[in-house]
């Protein structure tokens, strides 16, 4: 499949009359790097299995995970060069609970950002990041989708951690859902 020649900088999915909130919670810490590390033997093959490299595939991150303020839902360990979500991940209990919360809590709005590891040309990474974000967006129910302000790739060369290990690259092949409550200055 050919990589698109141009990827929009605006939200990938046009959102109906919904402006991005001003007071998003601060994003989880990130690393900006242009370093490229090679895949290890069998790293790609293992990444394409349901088990992948990390357990669990869905985690809460950001402020203290036990605190509902400024939590982010991180869906990680996508297969190398995959945009789709693994079947095992789709049945994750935390993912199911959070999707239900997102659908029923009408005060929440969302920003969804896709990430990739640093391997391969940046143009391909933007394609993967965009596809991952869009696929996670489509997991949301109709109410939560209608309250999503941003669905797009993360900034080029921005990662959750340095890509120097197998686990770090699996962590970076991810999507983060940033919830926001306009009723509060910051959630």
Write out the residue ranges for each language-model feature.
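Periplasmic OmpA-like peptidoglycan-binding domain that tethers envelope proteins to the cell wall
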Residues: 116-187
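Short glycine-rich, basic-tinged beta-strand/loop micro-motifs
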Residues: 108-118
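Periplasmic peptidoglycan-binding/tethering modules of Gram-negative envelope proteins
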Residues: 2-110, 166, 180-187
